[in-house]
Amino acid sequence: MRVAAVSAHFGRDVEPCLAKIEAITADARVRGVDLLVFPDATIGGYLGGFGAVGATGMPPAFPADDPVFDRLAAAAGPTVVCLSWRESDAGRFFNSAVCLTGDGVLGRHRKVHQPVGEVAAYAAGDRFTAFDTPVGRLGMLVDYDKTFPEAARTLAGDGAQLLACLSAWPASLTDRAPRLAQDRQSRLFDLYDCARAAENQVVVVSANQTGTMGRLRFLGQSKVVGPGGDVLARTWAKAGLACADLDVAAEVSRSRLNLSHLRERRPEAYA
């Protein structure tokens, strides 16, 4: 199976975002990609900063049943595609992810963990649930969710062997490095991807935005991480696809052959 994480910029204008999603998906299908994970805020971009709305304004919002998702499902065809947008639901807004193919929606997730200031744009989700897909049982994390070990552990405990991490992760706002690869947030972004994969012995497909939005400069660094925490493919700070070929079930099973972290947990000692 071939899995891929997208590293690209998605701005405020919806139609160019949709066209870019369609073009990247078509290219990935030609390249034999079975699972394609896009960054956070794929439709309409992320915030331009934390706190005040700023000059970039709020991202556009769509309900979960908007016809735009029929268009994107048609573009996905046989490929399993994960992407993200600002969801509107009865006057509330969520940072949401959807997983779909040409047959329709396979699963959804609303971002649970919010950095300071994000409450101005989004309400918080309240659960982590894995679901079955043609490429295996999968769970989704949006951006800051992956900072918290319990989030990925909950999905792994629910049977997920693949974690799709959709991010709009920026460089540090307070201590910027001259190069993105040297930035403190770049190191943390990589650390979380590798740690969540290794501690749960799952495959992590981590996508991130590039470019800038308002005050935020996004890191890129999309990657595929194996269940031992090893990086199998990455884009570094550039736009592109991080692609890796692997038998997910076999790799996960092999990583758990001698040490099985989920089986050997002692939750009664953690209280």
What are these regions (language model features)?
Residues 108-110, 234, 243:
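Residue-level detector of high-confidence beta-strand sites
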Residues 7-14:
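Short polar catalytic/cofactor-binding loops
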Residues 66-80, 147-240:
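CN hydrolase (nitrilase-like) catalytic-core segments centered on the catalytic cysteine
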Residues 14, 22-102, 170-194, 199-202:
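Cys-nucleophile CN-hydrolase/nitrilase-fold catalytic domain and related Cys-dependent amidase chemistry
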Residues 1-4:
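Extreme N-terminal starter segment of soluble prokaryotic enzymes
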Residues 257-271:
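C-terminal/domain-edge helix-coil "capping" segments
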Residues 88-177, 181-191, 253-261:
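Active-site catalytic loop in hydrolytic enzyme cores
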Residues 83-85, 95-99, 129, 222-224, ...:
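Short beta-strand scaffold segments in enzyme catalytic cores
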